[in-house]
A protein has these predicted regions:
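A detector of single, family-specific signature residues
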Residues: 1-167
Length: 167
């Protein structure tokens, strides 16, 4: 499988983020397909079921558990990948090696994601939120960073992956 990945156009995207390595990226991208169909990261979050359900009536608004609609494999992988952000942000030797040869914009996005997601994890835990709820919240934001990384890399990807790209 790793031999097939050498020529894969998404390899750079897969190597950019902490906790989101090649196999997870390959499965997620194959499950989600073309990310250009989502005009905003909130649409991708909703597609994956990482948004809260809502029960509203009149002036009362109640948000519940995540909707769990969409692809359960991709949602599960994002939740598993989000566990890497429990630790303090740092560029490890492994991550640094994976990021060799990548553009400065990709590395900056990776660091911004690491810093924000680790901070979000710590803040939610300090507020007394349960571990699973915190990890799902981090996975939801990780989803947005994956969408942004796809937008950033979109011009460099082959035309076959840009079939629905909107200007």
């Amino acid at each position: 499988m790793f031999e097939l990945l050498e020529g894969w156009e998404w390899k750079e995207v897969a190597d950019a983020l902490k906790g989101f390595q090649v196999v997870a990226a390959m499965i997620t991208i194959s499950e989600l397909g073309d990310l250009t169909r989502f005009k905003h990261p909130r649409q991708l979050m909703g597609f994956l079921g990482l948004v809260p359900s809502e029960d509203s009536t009149g002036t009362r608004r109640r948000q519940g558990a995540i909707t769990k609609c969409g692809n359960s494999h991709a949602r599960w992988l994002l939740i598993e990948s989000a566990q890497a952000y429990r630790n303090t942000p740092k560029v490890s030797a492994k991550l640094s090696k994976r990021q060799e040869g990548q553009s400065g914009a990709v590395k900056a996005l990776s660091w911004r994601a690491q810093d924000r997601l680790s901070g979000r994890y710590r803040r939610l835990k300090l507020r007394g939120k349960r571990e699973n709820k915190v990890i799902v919240a981090v996975a939801r934001e990780l989803c947005a960073f994956i969408w942004e990384l796809h937008q950033l890399m979109g011009d460099d990807l082959p035309a076959s992956t840009q079939t629905h790209r909107n200007p």
